[in-house]
Amino acid sequence: LPAIAEEPPQRVRAWLVVPGEAELRDQAVLKLPKGYRFLGGQETQRLLKQMGNFPSGAELGLITATAENEQWFMVVRYIDAGYVKDDEAANWDADALMTSIKEGTDEDNKTRQAQGFPPLVIRGWEEKPHYDKAASKVVWAISAQERETVGVNYNTLALGRQGYLSMNMVGSLEQLPVLKPHVGLLLSNVEFIEGKRYTDFDSTTDKVAAVGLSALIAGAAIKSGLLAKLWAFIIPLVIAGKKLLMLLVIALGGLAAKYFNKKPKPEQAGGGGGLSS
């Protein structure tokens, strides 16, 4: 990753590790508990791009744990798709969804191979999709294999009045028992603000999304850059016992170790994600 390592450190901001609230555009707030780091949107987009991914511009930040033995990360995005109807959630067919995901991945593999990436083989559900209607939130997990590497993509959606938040976590399959509590905590700590909540929807004025929850689940699995591209860089290092956080330090332009060993002052993060204590 020479291009990443050569990135000037003065262009990079430190991780925000102070417990507080990360503002997710003008839509929602993420309460960041002790033990987590948050990287702003602009830095996250640059990091993803430098690691071979193609950011959509919807990235608001990246979350990881402060503990060095916690080798995972989560990317937070907001998609201004409109109000996503949840009426089909009660009749989900998980097997049919998985078939759709595998078919879409087979097609996407043609593009991956043309770009020099090995094909991705979807193994199946590690956690079938389930919808919390009261909270308007969805959780599911899929495992996939790339060469000898098996990874897990843990996906969550939080539905709002004008769109939805996607919180996408990547880790190795053996980490699954460790990932699940983080997913639950972080998802429960994100809430849309008043006027932007799912229950604030006004059918007379608000835009309705062109797709439903099933399409979002299938599309997120097939088209997620994290599932399809970042594993080629990150998960092999995790499997080899190397530290994900050290890779991120290099990727962010050689950030000094002091950023990980002392408590920085709160500051605004770029790209729509800010942290306040």
Named regions from a protein language model:
Residues A209-G274:
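C-terminal single-pass membrane-anchor helix
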Residues E6-A28, Q42-V152, K207, G212-A218, ...:
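Conserved polar/disulfide-associated segments of primarily extracytoplasmic proteins
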Residues E6, G116-D200, T204:
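Short, well-structured beta-strand
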Residues N155, L186, A269-S277:
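N-terminal leader-region detector that preferentially activates on the first domain or presequence
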Residues V18-K31, E174-L185:
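Short aromatic-glycine motifs in intrinsically disordered, low-complexity regions
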Residues R25-A28, L32-Q42, L187, I193:
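Proline-anchored loop/turn motifs at beta-strand termini and strand-loop-strand connectors
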Residues L30, K34, D95, T99, ...:
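Solvent-exposed, polar/charged alpha-helical surfaces in well-ordered, non-transmembrane soluble domains
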